[in-house]
């Protein structure tokens, strides 16, 4: 009679949940450390083996295998069994598939497989290796779910499946994620451990440097050793991409993608980024994969930088992913996080036990056969007497007893004599039996040595591993390399030339140099920026996007921005106010700009002020330039910076004034001082209202011209050799013939002849013209028209655009 026991619901929930959790952990989601299989996978392989669906035989319907497994060993849904079977057949999921599938088993695009009634399957050769010697009492069996049959607790696993195919699974409160590896490398590492049980992780990694994913790709070295040592970690995996040319356009060709990435989803992800204009240089995207292999073609704009686009794709798409490592497996019925060395030792212990039990089984069989052969040989030695004894017996049992009593035979030996065919009585057959017996005795001796000697046992394990490597070993697919796992902004932004403009009211912007097309000398120019009527452009120059932009203020402070941090806008846009980018005081404004590639280089900064002062300070003094800025120069009341340039100790400086005067002197006359200093006199003015407009730094004897640009848009080139070297502090010589027609000097620039000149007016017009079109004149001349300006406009700034190399 049934008995009802009252139980606290909290206690029942607690106990039931623990039972459920342990069932999921041990019997469903986590692999056994010995064969690397979950129960459903083990049952599928064993069910296929029992059905005789072996390599070399014909495929059978997947539904037949699923039904066999479900009915005999795994009383759960057929969908779960079929899903597990399909995954073991997918070469993009398993490094070494255990099932050989025929038909539609899905795709790397995430397409579902055909129904089980349409597909066919059989064990793959490697799958069969998992069951090798299972008929030799190598593993323990247990009753199936209803006690009607026996199923293996673990497979013999001649293949180190957990290491080569990895595993993934989510249990209750824990999850496992083991990466796949290359079989040849795993075997080499296991052999090294057999030869040196005290082997270190570093020594193992000489043979097994890292995971080897079925889809190939690139794997970062960073994190591999830590994951192997602790059992936990994260590895960065990238697609393999090469650059091809199609016409004049670069094409990124993806040939391998990261493990467990859905190709169709990846392509959709890239397309979405292009549509959202997060990546702007992609003009075409095609999936060109076929039976020859995976191929995704990403066509770029003409002139685009493939590496920058690739870095953007790595950052924003699954072309770069993280593989989480959690080496969790079932050990003696309990889940444990293991190191790589632990995994290897557990597998070797399992194989030692399998080989020991196999040897014991084979020894027993060999001894039984040798025992029978001994009886047969005795019978052949007394064949006439044996025949007479058998003929004289009433029946077989009495004949067996008579043989046992007469020759001291066992029942098995006597029965074997009775079962012997007459043809074995010939002399040749006796020789064959003797040969077989001698062979058996050698085999028995070998098997006993294996069982008695640990070294011989390990040698047998090693031989099995080397056989597997010889038969199934292949080349590594995943390239282990070093790459930056995270991206700096520079990695995602093309290092292209940018035009930087700053207005009198402090509006700053950048736009690509290619926006300014070259025009002939004397043109009207293009609108470069919309300014308010009272606003004027004061600075324009060209710098690369990755350069450091140093901004010097009227208070003598310096700030730093990356050029790419400036807002990129169209030619007619005003820009963003500099105070939204820098922590400037209320009455502080930018007075001079300079671009450098890093502040840790040798050299000096040369400063020139409007009142003719000049100062020299080592560039390294500004290395600690942070968000808050630094003091760059101490300015006198009413004075302001007009120019800053990089220099070497042996260089010379030229200061040019708006009234057309210029002085050239060696910079060694300007003693290098600290940041918070004022400087010394560089030039004296003929007219009190004159002021310095340009600072030029040249090398001694440099074969260059000095290009003068006036406020009314006139210009000329004059050889540097026409400017005598003087001592600093003088009035210099005439460099430009100023007049009402041509205006005053706006800028003096160093040119070689192959560059372009970029001129910006106060009303926002800009012109870019080849320097070679501007003729050479002597110092005391005005030159030719460079830019045709309206009466109410004048040149604000000019800059030389270096020739492309």
Swiss-Prot record:
Q: Which GO terms describe its biological process?
A: DNA topological change; DNA-templated DNA replication
Q: Does the keyword DNA-binding apply?
A: yes
Q: Read off the Gene3D superfamilies from this record.
A: 3.30.1360.40, DNA gyrase/topoisomerase IV, subunit A, C-terminal, Topoisomerase II, domain 5, Topoisomerase, domain 3
Task: State which residue ranges cross the membrane.
Answer: none
What cellular component terms from Gene Ontology apply here? chromosome; cytoplasm; DNA topoisomerase type II (double strand cut, ATP-hydrolyzing) complex
Q: Would you say which domain of life the source belongs to?
A: Bacteria
Q: Where does the Topo IIA-type catalytic domain start and stop, copy by copy?
A: 30-492
As recorded in UniProt, its EC number(s) are: 5.6.2.2
Q: Which keywords does this Swiss-Prot/TrEMBL entry list?
A: ATP-binding, Cytoplasm, DNA-binding, Isomerase, Nucleotide-binding, Topoisomerase
One of the entry's Gene Ontology molecular-function terms is: DNA binding
Q: What SMART domains has UniProt attached to this entry?
A: TOP4c
The annotated subunit structure for this chain is: Heterotetramer, composed of two GyrA and two GyrB chains. The two subunits form an intertwined dimer where the GyrB ATPase transducer helix of 1 subunit connects to the Toprim domain of the other GyrB subunit through a 10 residue linker. In the heterotetramer, GyrA contains the active site tyrosine that forms a transient covalent intermediate with the DNA, while GyrB binds cofactors and catalyzes ATP hydrolysis.
Q: What else is known?
A: For the electron microscopy studies a GyrB-GyrA fusion protein was made with a Gly-Asp-Leu linker between the 2 subunits. It forms the expected dimer. Few gyrases are as efficient as E.coli at forming negative supercoils. Not all organisms have 2 type II topoisomerases; in organisms with a single type II topoisomerase this enzyme also has to decatenate newly replicated chromosomes.
Query: What family is this?
Result: Belongs to the type II topoisomerase GyrA/ParC subunit family.
Q: Could you tell me what this protein is called?
A: DNA gyrase subunit A
Q: What species was this sequence derived from?
A: Thermus thermophilus (strain ATCC 27634 / DSM 579 / HB8)
* Lineage of the organism: Bacteria, Thermotogati, Deinococcota, Deinococci, Thermales
């Amino acid at each position: 009679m049934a008995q009802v026991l009252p139980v606290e619901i909290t206690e029942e929930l607690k106990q039931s949940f623990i039972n459920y959790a342990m069932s999921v952990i041990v019997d469903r989601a986590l692999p056994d450390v010995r064969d690397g299989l979950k129960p459903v996978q083990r049952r599928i392989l064993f069910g296929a083996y029992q059905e005789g669906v072996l390599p070399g035989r014909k495929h059978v319907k997947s539904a037949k295998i699923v039904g066999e497994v479900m009915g005999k060993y795994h009383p759960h849904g057929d969908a779960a069994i079929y899903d597990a079977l399909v995954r073991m057949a997918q070469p993009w999921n398993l490094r070494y598939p255990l099932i050989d599938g025929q038909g539609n088993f899905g795709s790397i695009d995430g397409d579902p497989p055909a129904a089980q009634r349409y597909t066919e399957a059989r064990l793959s050769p490697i799958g069969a290796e998992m069951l090798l010697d299972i008929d030799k009492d190598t593993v323990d069996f247990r009753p199936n779910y209803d006690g009607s049959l026996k199923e293996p607790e673990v497979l013999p696993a001649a293949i180190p499946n957990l290491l080569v195919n990895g595993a993934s699974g989510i249990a209750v409160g824990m999850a496992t994620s083991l990466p796949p590896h290359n079989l040849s490398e795993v075997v080499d590492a296991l052999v090294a451990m057999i030869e040196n049980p005290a082997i270190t992780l570093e020594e193992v990694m000489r043979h097994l440097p890292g995971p080897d994913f079925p889809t190939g790709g690139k794997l970062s070295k960073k994190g591999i050793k830590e994951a192997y040592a602790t059992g936990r970690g994260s590895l960065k995996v990238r697609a393999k991409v090469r650059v091809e040319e199609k016409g004049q356009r670069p094409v990124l060709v993806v040939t391998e993608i990261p493990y467990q990435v859905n190709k169709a989803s990846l392509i959709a992800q890239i397309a979405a980024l292009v549509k959202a204009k997060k990546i702007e240089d992609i003009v075409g995207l095609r999936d060109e994969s076929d039976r020859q292999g995976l191929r995704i073609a990403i066509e770029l704009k003409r002139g685009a930088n493939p590496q920058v686009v690739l870095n953007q794709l790595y950052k924003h798409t699954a072309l770069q992913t993280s593989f989480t490592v959690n080496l969790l497996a079932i050990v003696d019925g309990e889940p444990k996080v293991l190191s790589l060395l632990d995994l290897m030792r557990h597998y070797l212990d399992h194989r030692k036990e399998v080989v020991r039990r196999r040897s014991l089984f084979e020894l027993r069989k060999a001894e039984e056969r040798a025992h029978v052969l001994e009886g047969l040989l005795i019978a052949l030695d007394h064949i006439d007497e044996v025949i007479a004894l058998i003929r004289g017996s009433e029946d077989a049992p009495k004949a067996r007893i008579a043989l046992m009593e007469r020759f001291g035979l066992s029942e098995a030996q006597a029965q074997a004599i009775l079962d012997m065919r007459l043809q074995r009585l010939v002399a040749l057959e006796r020789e064959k039996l003797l040969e077989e017996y001698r062979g058996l005795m050698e085999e028995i001796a070998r098997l006993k040595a294996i069982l008695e000697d640990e070294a011989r046992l390990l040698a047998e394990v090693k031989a099995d591993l080397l056989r597997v490597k010889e038969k199934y070993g292949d080349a590594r697919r995943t390239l282990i390399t070093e790459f930056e796992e995270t991206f700096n902004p520079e990695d995602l932004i093309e290092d292209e030339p940018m035009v930087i403009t700053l207005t009198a009211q402090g509006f700053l912007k950048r736009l690509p140099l290619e926006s300014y097309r070259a025009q002939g000398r004397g043109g009207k120019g293009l609108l470069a920026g919309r300014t308010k009527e009272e606003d004027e452009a004061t600075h324009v120059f060209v710098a690369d996007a990755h350069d450091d932009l140093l901004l010097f203020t009227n208070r003598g402070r310096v700030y730093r921005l990356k050029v790419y941090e400036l807002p990129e806008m169209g030619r007619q846009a005003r820009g963003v106010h500099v105070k939204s980018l820098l922590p400037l005081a209320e009455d502080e404004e930018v007075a001079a700009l300079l671009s450098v590639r890093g502040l840790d280089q040798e050299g000096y900064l040369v400063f020139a002020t409007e009142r003719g002062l000049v100062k020299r300070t080592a560039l390294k003094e500004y290395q600690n330039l942070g968000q808050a800025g630094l003091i760059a120069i101490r300015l006198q009341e009413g004075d302001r910076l007009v120019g800053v340039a990089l220099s070497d100790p042996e260089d010379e400086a030229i200061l040019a004034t708006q009234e057309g005067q210029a002085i050239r002197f060696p910079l060694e006359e300007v003693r290098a001082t600290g940041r918070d200093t004022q400087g010394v006199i560089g030039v004296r003015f003929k007219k009190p209202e004159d002021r310095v407009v340009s600072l030029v730094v040249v090398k001694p004897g440099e074969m260059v011209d000095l290009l003068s640009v006036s406020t009314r848009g006139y210009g000329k080139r004059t050889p540097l050799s026409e400017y005598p070297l003087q001592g600093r502090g003088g009035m210099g010589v005439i460099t430009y013939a100023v007049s009402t027609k041509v205006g005053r000097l706006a800028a003096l620039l160093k040119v070689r002849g192959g560059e372009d000149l970029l001129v910006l007016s106060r009303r926002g017009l800009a012109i870019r013209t080849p320097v070679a079109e501007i003729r050479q004149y002597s110092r005391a001349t005005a030159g030719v028209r460079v830019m045709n300006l309206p009466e109410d406009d004048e040149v604000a700034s000019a800059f030389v655009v270096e020739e492309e190399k």
